[in-house]
């Protein structure tokens, strides 16, 4: 019975890793598109965080179950568990590389935006926006106009 519970746990982790693979692929598509849609990217990031939190919980449950029945991954004595564990390791490794790639793409976008802001700030001598995030008034012929 306890081995069945462990098998179910590993199955749930596999399902979540497959879902995470889909979410990471969506994130990569967004990061590779010409212009990032912040709200959409935020939603994908929240999905990713939720899946990772659930995976962390399931993994902690797995470790507790292993301790209780004195068994440990890679489960070489239980073929059904060993097969699932191997698949988990393969998916996790692929996700690690995909996530690293997405991180590099995101870093490129951040650097591009930082450079663009630096150009804007040097050309105009000062920030286009005030501390409140609203556009500063522009002066034309000695008069201040608010936009």
Swiss-Prot record:
This is Flagella synthesis protein FlgN. The keyword Cytoplasm applies. It holds the Pfam family FlgN. Signal peptide: none annotated. Belongs to the FlgN family. It comes from the Bacteria. It comes from Yersinia enterocolitica. Coiled coil: none annotated. Required for the efficient initiation of filament assembly. InterPro entries: FlgN-like, FlgN-like_sf. It is found in: Cytoplasm. GO terms for cellular component: cytoplasm. Keywords: Bacterial flagellum biogenesis, Cytoplasm. GO terms for biological process: bacterial-type flagellum assembly. Transmembrane segments: none annotated. The keyword Cytoplasm applies.
């Amino acid at each position: 019975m306890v081995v069945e519970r462990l098998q179910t746990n590993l199955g749930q982790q596999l399902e979540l890793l497959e879902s995470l693979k889909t979410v990471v692929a969506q994130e990569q598509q967004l990061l590779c598109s010409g212009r990032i849609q912040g709200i959409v990217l935020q939603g994908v990031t929240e999905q990713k965080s939720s899946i990772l939190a659930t995976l962390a919980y399931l993994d902690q449950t797995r470790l507790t179950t292993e301790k209780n029945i004195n068994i440990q991954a890679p489960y070489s004595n239980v073929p059904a568990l060993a097969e699932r564990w191997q698949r988990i390791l393969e998916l996790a490794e692929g996700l690690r590389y995909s996530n690293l790639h997405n991180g590099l793409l995101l870093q490129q976008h951040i650097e591009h935006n930082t450079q663009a802001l630096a150009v804007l700030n040097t050309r105009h001598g000062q920030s286009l926006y005030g501390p409140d995030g609203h556009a500063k008034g522009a002066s034309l012929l000695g008069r201040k106009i608010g936009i």
